[in-house]
Structure formats: structure tokens, C-alpha cells
């Protein structure tokens, strides 16, 4: 599967880089979505799926072989 990041998700990732360990965990979780787009702990929220990674939530959309990272939020 192919993973792309929205502009908002990219900007948020950069903004949260003060927490490098947290963003590395987010990046690993996002890369793992290519192998398993519905991992244990991912919740469906409307047209999107939400994955919790430590204090962060990753909102993403699966469309065929394309995964779009829509947004990253801090809890």
C-alpha cells in the first residue's frame, strides 16, 4: 500500500518535532499501516480511521491501495 501525508498532517508533524521520540513512534506506526491498515486499536470514525500512538492520534483514510494521513493531534 502507498502512504501519503496531507499538508496539514505534514505541518503538524513538523510542529510536534520538539517531541522527537513521539514523532518517531508516530512515523513507525504510520509506516506499519502499509502492511496492516486496520491494526489492533484503530477505530473507525466516519470515513476515517483513528490510531492512538502514545499521546498522539493519527487520523487516516484508506482508499483501495492508498492510505492518506489526514491529521495528527495531541491528546
Residue ranges and their predicted role:
Residues 1-3, 29-30:
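Short hydrophobic/aromatic-rich motifs at helix boundaries and adjacent loops
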Residues 27-52:
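A short, surface-exposed loop/turn module that caps and links secondary-structure elements
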Residues 2-3, 14-15, 20-23, 53-57, ...:
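Enriched for short, Lys/Arg-rich terminal
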Residues 5-9:
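Basic, amphipathic "hinge/linker" alpha-helix immediately C-terminal to the N-terminal HTH DNA-binding motif
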